[in-house]
């Protein structure tokens, strides 16, 4: 059976449980950030979740490429067979779970909620090729388990243990824990939600910052950056170097997210003092490939360079100088640059309308 999918709750959801528990002050900051644009990787992950849910539910799935089917769906289903080799599991896919009155308005969706004998099973699909996600002490899955225990009692009736499973083809990670551990997590979550609504809710940096959308404006991280730029590296001992290296990835992520936030603001016509949108440096392309072939032969270029038509850069290297009028410079998009950059600023539609009006 398949439950209706729902959006994740705003205060905390499965994927944000670790951040909210470790940094309750992040909730208010994230609420003020502009909405995120879904990446192509996220869209692909959503598609794969929908496809595998339909297959398990006995429905006709959306069409996907043969590569995705063979490298993601087939191995994922094979790994599911390791969890349920005898096909004994009672299960639901994409099922909404929540905490009821215990923590109002906090909910999420479990990819697969199941039960075999005295064991409840919480299974999450991960189709990304990046960092391998561990199941042990995974707060996202403990969130789903705690919420399912309150809202889907059938999966916990007579249960003495809970198994958290992450299938991330070609890997599978499994961890069996107790109902008592899920209860302790639930208490942690309750306390964090209570703290999150306070104006002085604590902020704390750590691994949970990785996917936080408020990272670019977080005072904890901006403070760490301020301290880092003042460090005199020649004076650091080996222990201090080790400590700074541990923080480096976090600061790299902060810088990347800050640039992305500023770029998105400029793309939307907002003003970032000292910065502007400019066209990316153009790549030369042939204006007319047929005319380019004729001109290159006349200039002395021979096969196979003409038959396959090499790039303007390669042709120029061989001929020393290209005939005039054969190429055009094409920009691949816009990028952010300081006002001191000599390239002219690109005005977005909203800015153009202001100038006209």
Put a short name on every predicted segment:
Residues 52, 73, 189, 244-262:
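Short amphipathic alpha-helical coiled-coil/interface segments
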Residues 56, 127-130, 145-156, 194-197, ...:
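Hydrophobic/aromatic-lined pockets within catalytic cores
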Residues 163, 182-250, 346-357:
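Short, charged, low-complexity amphipathic alpha-helix
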Residues 88-194:
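Mg2+/Mn2+-dependent nuclease catalytic core
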Residues 253-357:
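Extended, charge-rich alpha-helical segments
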Residues 37, 41, 132-134, 237:
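Alpha-helix N-cap/helix-initiation motif
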């Amino acid at each position: 059976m398949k439950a209706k999918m729902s959006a994740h709750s705003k205060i905390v959801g499965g994927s944000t449980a670790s951040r909210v528990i470790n940094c309750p002050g992040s909730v208010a900051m994230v609420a003020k950030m502009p909405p995120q644009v879904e990446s192509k990787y996220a869209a692909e992950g959503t598609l794969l979740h929908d496809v595998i849910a339909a297959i398990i539910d006995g429905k006709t799935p959306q069409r996907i490429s043969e590569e995705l089917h063979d490298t993601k769906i087939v191995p994922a289903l094979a790994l599911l067979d390791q969890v349920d080799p005898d096909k004994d599991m009672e299960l639901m896919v994409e099922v909404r779970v929540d905490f009821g009155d215990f923590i109002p308005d906090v909910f999420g969706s479990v990819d697969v909620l199941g039960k075999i004998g005295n064991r409840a099973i919480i299974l999450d699909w991960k189709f990304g090729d990046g960092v391998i996600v561990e199941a042990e002490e995974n707060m996202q899955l403990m969130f789903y388990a705690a919420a399912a225990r309150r809202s889907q009692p059938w999966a916990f009736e007579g249960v003495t243990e809970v198994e958290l499973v992450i299938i991330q083809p070609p890997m599978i990670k499994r961890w069996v824990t107790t109902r008592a551990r899920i209860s302790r997590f639930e208490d942690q979550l309750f306390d964090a939600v209570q703290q999150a609504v306070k104006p002085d809710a604590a902020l704390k940096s750590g691994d949970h910052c990785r996917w936080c959308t408020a990272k670019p404006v977080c005072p904890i991280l901006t403070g760490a950056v301020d301290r880092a730029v003042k460090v005199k590296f020649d004076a650091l001992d080996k222990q201090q170097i080790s400590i700074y290296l541990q923080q480096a990835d976090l600061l790299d992520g902060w810088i990347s997210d800050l640039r992305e936030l500023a770029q998105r603001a400029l793309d939307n016509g907002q003003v970032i003092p000292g910065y502007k949108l400019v066209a990316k440096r153009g790549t030369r392309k042939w204006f007319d490939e047929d005319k380019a072939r004729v001109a290159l032969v006349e200039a002395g270029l021979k096969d196979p360079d003409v038959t396959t038509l090499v790039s303007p850069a390669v042709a120029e290297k061989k001929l020393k100088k290209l005939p005039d009028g054969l190429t055009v410079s094409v920009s691949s998009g816009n990028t952010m640059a300081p006002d001191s950059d000599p390239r002219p600023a690109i005005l977005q539609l909203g800015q153009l309308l202001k100038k006209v009006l």
